[in-house]
């Protein structure tokens, strides 16, 4: 299932951050889950679509697409 949300914050140096979903939950995102070529980063407030999978520490985003 594909969801949409806004990037709550993303640390480009460490390569991870969180996406805020409409239901108020935050989903972990790692740079390796961002689609596209080149340097993979997200900007705070940027809208994205993504799927959710269960990671070792809870839900995490995969197939993240910048909208």
Swiss-Prot record:
CSD domain segment(s): 5-64
> What span is annotated as the signal peptide, if there is one?
none
Keywords for the protein's UniProt record, in alphabetical order: Activator, Cytoplasm, DNA-binding, Transcription, Transcription regulation
Q: Report any one BP term from Gene Ontology.
A: regulation of gene expression
A single Gene Ontology CC annotation of this entry is:
cytoplasm
Q: Does the keyword Cytoplasm apply?
A: yes
Cytoplasm as a keyword of this entry, yes or no, is: yes
Q: Where in the cell is it found?
A: Cytoplasm
**Alphabetized GO MF terms:** DNA binding; nucleic acid binding
Q: What does this protein do?
A: Can bind to ATTGG and CCAAT motifs (Y-box motifs) of single-stranded oligonucleotides.
Self-association or partners: how does it assemble?
Answer: Homodimer.
- The name of this protein is Cold shock-like protein CspE
Gene encoding it? cspE
